[in-house]
Amino acid sequence: MTLQNVTVIIPAHNRPERLRRLLDYYSRTDIKVLVPDSSDHPFADAEKYPDITYLHRPKLHFLLKLKEVLPMISTPYVLYCADDDFAVPSGIAQMTAFLDEHPDYSTAQGHYLTFTPHKGKISFYP
C-alpha cells in the first residue's frame, strides 16, 4: 500500500514525547509529514527524521502555523493529525480510495477509538 499521495500535518506544541512517538510511527510509511511546532524549545530529535519537514516557530498561533505549511503541500490529499492521535495507514488508504471513487466529496473522516489506561487495564470506547 502506497500513501505517497497524502501529506499529514502534525501541529505540535510542548509535547515532544508525543511528537516523537508519532514521528516514529509515520517514518515507517511513505506519507509526507509536515510539523509546524510552536513549542518553546525546538524538538531535539528533529534531525533523526530526515524525510519529515520540521518547522520550529516558537509561540506561533495555531492558525498561523497551518497557514505557513499549507503552501508546502504538493499531494492531492491532506490529513490533519494532532500529536496525540494516530491515523492508521489502512484507514488513510480507505479514505483516499473513497475520495477517488466519489469526486463529489471533498472530505472524509474515519472512526475514532479512545483508550484509557486504569489500574493495569485499558478501556476502549468509540
Residue spans of the language-model regions?
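Glycine-rich, basic loop-to-helix element that forms the pyrophosphate-binding segment
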Residues: R57-I73
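The conserved acidic donor/metal-binding loop of glycosyltransferases
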Residues: A82-F86
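Short alpha-helix within the catalytic core of nucleotide-sugar-dependent glycosyltransferases
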Residues: L23-D24, T75, V88-D100
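Cell-envelope/extracellular polymer assembly enzymes that use nucleotide-activated donors
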Residues: N5-T7, K32
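Short, well-formed alpha-helical segments that are part of the catalytic scaffolds
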Residues: P11-R28
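Conserved donor NDP-sugar-binding/catalytic core segment of glycosyltransferases
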Residues: I92-F124
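Short aromatic/hydrophobic "clamp" motif used to bind/position activated sugar donors
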Residues: V78
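Acidic donor-binding segment of Leloir-type glycosyltransferases
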Residues: D24-H56
